[in-house]
C-alpha cells in the first residue's frame, strides 16, 4: 500500500486558537485525524507532519521524492502556510524531488490580503485548492489520488 504525506507549515500548529474566524475551531490534531481516516477510505496510509521551519519542510519533501521513486509514496498534500507566498526554496524542492503535490489552504487566500494572492508553490504543484476549511484536506487527498501517476517499485 502506498502512503500519502500531509505536510503543514508555519503556524498551523496553532489551528483552533489562531484567528478562528478565518481558520475555524478545529485543531491540527483534528486535521490529522481527518486525513488518516480519509486515507484509510482511499486505501492509503497517511503520515502527517508539521513544522514551523522551512528547512525541515524541504528535508521532508526530499525524503518524499525518494519514497516516490521506491514506489512507497503517492505524493504530498502541502499547506505551506505563509511560506507559500515567500519560499522559492520550497518550489525548488518540489521540482527537484519530482513528487506530486497538491497545494492546499484552509482559507480562500485569493479573497484575503493581496500579499497572499501569489504562490511560489503553485507552479511546482500538480493542483491548488483553497477555501474549503479543514474538510478540504479530505478533498485534497482525493485529488492527489486522482492525479498522481501510478508508481511502481524500482
Swiss-Prot record:
Substrate binds at residues 79, 85, 92, 106-107, 116. Disulfide bonds: none annotated. It comes from the Bacteria. It catalyses: 3-dehydroquinate = 3-dehydroshikimate + H2O. GO terms for molecular function: 3-dehydroquinate dehydratase activity. Keywords: Amino-acid biosynthesis, Aromatic amino acid biosynthesis, Lyase, Plasmid. Pathway: Metabolic intermediate biosynthesis; chorismate biosynthesis; chorismate from D-erythrose 4-phosphate and phosphoenolpyruvate: step 3/7. The keyword Glycoprotein does not apply. GO terms for biological process: amino acid biosynthetic process; aromatic amino acid family biosynthetic process; chorismate biosynthetic process; quinate catabolic process. CDD domains: DHQase_II. PROSITE patterns: DEHYDROQUINASE_II. The record marks 18 as: Transition state stabilizer. The keyword Amino-acid biosynthesis applies. Its EC number is 4.2.1.10. It is an enzyme of class 4 (lyase). The active site is at 23 (proton acceptor), 105 (proton donor). Homododecamer. Belongs to the type-II 3-dehydroquinase family. NCBIfam families: aroQ, PRK05395.1-2, PRK05395.1-3, PRK05395.1-4. Catalyzes a trans-dehydration via an enolate intermediate. This is 3-dehydroquinate dehydratase 2. It comes from Ralstonia nicotianae (strain ATCC BAA-1114 / GMI1000) (Ralstonia solanacearum).
Amino acid at each position: 500500500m502506498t502512503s500519502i504525506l500531509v505536510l503543514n507549515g508555519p503556524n498551523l500548529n496553532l489551528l483552533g486558537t489562531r484567528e478562528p474566524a478565518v481558520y475555524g475551531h478545529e485543531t491540527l490534531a483534528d486535521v490529522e485525524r481527518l486525513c488518516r481516516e480519509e486515507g484509510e477510505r482511499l486505501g492509503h496510509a497517511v503520515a502527517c507532519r508539521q513544522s514551523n521551519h522551512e528547512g525541515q519542510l524541504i528535508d521532508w519533501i526530499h525524503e518524499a521524492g525518494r519514497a516516490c521513486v521506491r514506489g512507497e509514496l503517492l505524493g504530498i498534500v502541502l499547506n505551506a502556510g505563509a511560506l507559500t507566498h515567500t519560499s522559492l526554496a520550497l518550489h525548488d524542492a518540489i521540482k527537484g524531488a519530482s513528487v506530486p503535490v497538491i497545494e492546499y489552504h484552509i482559507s480562500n487566500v485569493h479573497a484575503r490580503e493581496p500579499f497572499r494572492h501569489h504562490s511560489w508553490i503553485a507552479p511546482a504543484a500538480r493542483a491548488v485548492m483553497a477555501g474549503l476549511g479543514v474538510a478540504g484536506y479530505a478533498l485534497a487527498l482525493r485529488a492527489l489520488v486522482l492525479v498522481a501517476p501510478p508508481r511502481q517499485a524500482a
